[in-house]
Amino acid sequence: MENKIYGCIDLKSFYASVECAERGLDPFKTNLVVADPSRGSGGICLAISPAMKNLGIKNRCRLFEIPKNVKYITALPRMKKYMEYSANIYSIYLKYMSKEDIYIYSIDECFFDFTPYLSSYGKTPREFAVMLMEAVMKNTGVCATAGIGTNLFLAKVALDITAKHISDNIGFLDENEFKKTIWHHRPITDIWNIGKGIAKRLEKYGVQDLYGVAHMDESILYKEFGANAEFLIDHSKGYEPCTIKEIHDYKPKTESISNGQILFNDYSFDDALIVLYEMVDQLVLELTQRKSKTDSISLYVRYSKECTASTGGTRKLNFRSSSYSKISAEFEKLYRETTKKNYPIRQINVGLNHIEEDEFQQLDLFGKVDDDKEIKAQKGIIEIKNKFGKNAVLRCSSLQDKATARIRNKLVGGHNGEL
């Protein structure tokens, strides 16, 4: 079996680095925050420059948490600009590698299969990573960090943990080095894919690091985590069989689409229903554009300052459709049945599950005629929005004071999208 070498490259403080590059500033010498001041002092900083990180300020802090004596530039988020930079950086990678050997993990992070290129370029894994990082820096002004490993998991952990303690910001891990340096690392939540929930469940058994996981009775892990225990067991030993090729080849049995938003302020039961309709409308148009239908919906509602437990649920529909009127009616039923009326609402997530292409459908002559008319209208709306912008056509409910669609249509990822 071929010995594999993988890389994982992260664009350092990406949004902040882009804003510094656009201003001709050095992110390592400039205090810069990417945030929207109009959201108040509690607004989250999407990124801070490396210079501010060196002052001990946390990356995802809120504006009021930045020490008063620290002077800094505030840059309004420009999501389209960051996407433009990300696409440009991906094109730089493609000058050195085939797209089949690259997996885009996020807007600022990619995995690579270095294996076929090391002999071709006559470079070590570290030298190859440096070549890519220097090309990005030269062409965009954005600095990067990297992790190198003998599998994808080790490359990611080398990036997230090991690289932070190396002068050239490039970490390396094989299974032996992993056991020496990562097995006893704490907190365990620093490890990729281990969140606070998993950590809390492991703590019940006195386990606080991957060494503890590796030496647990596997039957206990399977009882606690089900099928997901396999990932924990493999990763606790530094093992990951999945390859980039397998990721590219993977086709899920069923697909789903979702939409979520954190509201700018507390919403009443009735006002939140307006937003729910808007979010369902957006999902249904996406469903129509995919030429697909759904037979399952899901809803999640979180209340202000966690004053009460979140609510929601998943519902199987007795029909498969992409009709807004049918799907929105089912969402309203689910909302009214599960949502607490007397608590302020701060977050809503909606989802359409079991999405399949509209190849076969049960015969329902009268229902189909009505559906066809509505789908035709939805396709017309999509064409108008694509040509004239998302706000060119809105439902009447989106003109109400508590509606958010008009504002959110100008955003990308919930933030300002302008260049």
Question: What does each of the following model-derived ranges do?
Answer:
Residues 1-107, 111, 236:
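Residues that scaffold, gate, or flank divalent-cation-dependent active/transport sites
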Residues 8, 200-344:
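DNA-contacting surface of Y-family translesion DNA polymerases
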Residues 18, 313, 317-419:
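Acidic, metal-coordinating catalytic segment for phosphate/diphosphate chemistry
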Residues 18-20, 44-47, 154-162, 204, ...:
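Short acidic, glycine/serine/threonine-rich loops at helix termini
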Residues 105-109, 149-152, 292-296, 343-347:
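Short Gly/Ser/Thr- and Asp/Glu-enriched loop/turn motifs at secondary-structure junctions
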Residues 112-133, 206:
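Catalytic palm subdomain of template-directed nucleic-acid polymerases
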Residues 124-189, 349, 359:
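Long, highly charged, low-complexity intrinsically disordered interaction regions
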